[in-house]
Amino acid sequence: MQRLVEVESVSFEEDNNEISLRPSNWDDYIGQEKIKKNLRVFIDASKKRKEALDHILFYGPPGLGKTTLSYLISNEMNTNIKVTAGPMIEKSGDLAAILTNLEEGDILFIDEIHRLSPAVEEILYPAMEDYRLDIIIGSGPAAQTVKIDLPRFTLIGATTRAGMLSNPLRERFGMHFRMQFYTEIELAKIIQKASLKLGKNCEDDASLEISKRSRGTPRVALRLLRRVRDFSEVENEKSIHLQRCKYALDELGVNESGFDEMDINLLELLISNRGKPMGLSTIAAALSEDEGTIEDAIEPYLLANGYIERTARGRVASVKTYEMFRLSYPTSLKLEDDLTQGKLF
């Protein structure tokens, strides 16, 4: 069963809903202010020169608006955007077919770009750098390289694992942007705008309540909004109010910190280890969960908000987590922290 606070997997129906709620201009796009400010400068400069925008890499946890920003860039540049994903490009021929169908100034958006195979990456290098496609025809001594000129295009890559990108690929992006978690105020504004598009007003305090439980992630906020709206409509309420909102979210198993059962299980597991670090593989086995899911979908929010810490030996629960569970922080850990920070000498 899909987690309500899951940020990686998106159903077809939900993806269509997200598209309908997607902002169409910079003023409608809330959050990521520094990125927006820089992008507007680069886009304006590119339009004045009548050149294709330089290649862009967006990285950071899932659900923070990488795809939405790419569509916005397409709108601002008044160009077409073609969307694909790393796992869908299995062979170099697949990428060659996509590239040769691009037109001057088009944007190619590749999600999960870190999952491209090395063979596909090799095709991408000259395409990004020289707008040229090198295709090998035949094999052995009779093999020939055919060079095909490509229109000047912009590649936008998105990844949740920037560290898995090869250096040659990473270096070919002219702009690198790290997506940040959203503040509660930013999410509340997103929720209010989205609720009106859904035909259901969400009151200010209810919007803030949803934002508090959305893990700093718009995708989660919009998903929770739709579910809270369901509860409200069943009761024939004209708007979403705070009491209904709290009731719905509690029923859905999302607590005031935005944690669900999976988060609680992870934190309880770390606490049960009596302060000793746990490796990722051990955690995954204990929770019967995939390592990638833990690393990409569960950990980022817990790390960013100080609930868990990564050490050279593994993951440990932080003081904040012990306080949340109303437990005493292990003395051995406190002593180790003091030694590390030089507080005892």
Swiss-Prot record:
Binding site for DNA: R310, R315
Residues annotated for Mg(2+) binding in this entry: T67
Organism superkingdom: Bacteria
UniProtKB keywords: ATP-binding, Cytoplasm, DNA damage, DNA recombination, DNA repair, DNA-binding, Hydrolase, Nucleotide-binding
Positions of the UniProt region annotated as Small ATPAse domain (RuvB-S): 183-253
Family to which this protein belongs: Belongs to the RuvB family.
NCBIfam families linked: PRK00080.1 (NF000868), ruvB (TIGR00635)
The protein's name in its UniProt record: Holliday junction branch migration complex subunit RuvB
Organism: Aliarcobacter butzleri (strain RM4018)
Gene: ruvB
